[in-house]
Amino acid sequence: GLYLQAELPMWIKDVGQYPARRDYFEKEMYAILEEYGNHPSFILMCNGNENEGNFDVLEDLVKKAQKYDDRRLYSASTARTHTASDQYYTSHVTSKGWITVYEGRPSTDWDRSKETEIDCPVIAHETGQRCMFPNFDEIKKYTGVLVPRNFEVFRERLARNGMLHQADDFFKATGMHTELQYKEVNEALLLNRKSGGFLLLGLPA
């Protein structure tokens, strides 16, 4: 099954700069714990994604959450900084090296044991964040603010260079390559007895 990590809606570079915003996050944290706290898969709680700034503020939130509801594990932020209050750490990298492999180079070196051997469980962040060529047939499925303008840019570039007829081949080839990479990276983490697992980017409700 899947375990859920809930996050505060915090993805900022100046944590702690605005007291009113900090108060909002604390209220939101309590609201999340109150509303979803009994969900059996809700085992991890994090203050937000790739935050930067005053981590004392984030540690304070972690300690308050732990005191309020100790049924799950808490972490200050995904990526960027590992804090003393972290009961687990989700990141691309630890103090011992990279745990999320982004490079597409051919390789047989998938051992991430050393990199995940720190003082708390380590979960690899964004292992599925891989690029592939777009499917231009999907453009017509979206309207309004969701129209994929970036797809239109790539389609125009292909047409300008006389390669538009290859678009479907590019889509299929890069999709297969992405699938192979995703499989190898996640299997490497599953085979690593020191790994705490890997984090999927999102789970639609």
Language-model segments: what does each one mean?
Residues 53-66, 79-117, 132-136, 190-192, ...:
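Substrate-binding cleft/loops of secretory-pathway carbohydrate-active enzymes
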Residues 45, 106-205:
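Substrate-binding clefts and catalytic carboxylate motifs of secreted carbohydrate-active enzymes
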Residues 21-23, 100-102, 176:
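Short, flexible loop segments at the rims of nucleotide/cofactor-binding pockets, characterized by
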Residues 71, 85-86, 99, 151, ...:
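Generic intrinsically disordered, low-complexity segments enriched for polar/acidic and small residues
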Residues 24-25, 63-67, 93-96, 141-146:
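Short, low-complexity, polar/charged sequence segments that are solvent-exposed and flexible
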Residues 1-86, 117:
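Active-site mouth of glycoside hydrolases
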